[in-house]
Amino acid sequence: MLFSESSVSNDCTYKGRKLYGRILLVSSNPDLRVRSVNSIPDLRVQTVTTVPSRCGEWQMVTSNPDLRVQIDPSFGEFTIQFVESFPGVGP
């Protein structure tokens, strides 16, 4: 599957959903399905323990998520790369 650069909007949304906040990783019934890559992602993701307020900041939670995400190794609506710093849209 090909991923376009425009799949994640510059305002850090995808199909109207913000791509930062409290994230619950699930194995079924996700709000979004993503594919994790090692380079050239649509979104760079940094896991944080504080309140996520910037694009790509994900606080992993076990309840009351803003977004339910499934990481699929072979298919995703867009690609993500986990990073230690500089989260956000694009490579």
What is the predicted role of each segment?
Residues 2-91:
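Repetitive, compositionally biased segments used for assembly/scaffolding
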